[in-house]
Amino acid sequence: FQMLHSEIMTIMQERQKVNILIFDNCGFGCINNLEMNHGIGSLATEFRYTDGKKPTGDLIPVDYAKIGEGYGLKTYTCHTIEELVNALEDAKKQDKACLFDLKVLPKTMTDGYESWWDVGIATTSEKESVRKACEGVLKGREEARVY
């Protein structure tokens, strides 16, 4: 969502009834998973305050519902399943786009995805974890279908 939310303007221009669900895990969780699985650690994919040099402080809270309000959407912030169920029921009654700011725990993404993603990785590194991840990437490339 933070990478590109200009689609909301198009939704509003066209008066479309769209439900937008944002799973707020305090970062780019999918990219963080890729980094961690490739042995390189997090490269600022968690939204944290810095100590002046590195983002190692507390997580930065973002109120995505307020961003949606700024665009004129009906918004909901949900911390529990019950809040989400109630918000979904209310959203059915709305005649405009709705945004759901779903507060989830960091690092609670679905693992695996039952697929393979060819992500570039260093072929030489001082870190054993990167060298091992590189072996996995090279093996995956050998097994990948050519289209």
Stretch-by-stretch model annotation:
Residues F1-Y147:
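Thiamine diphosphate
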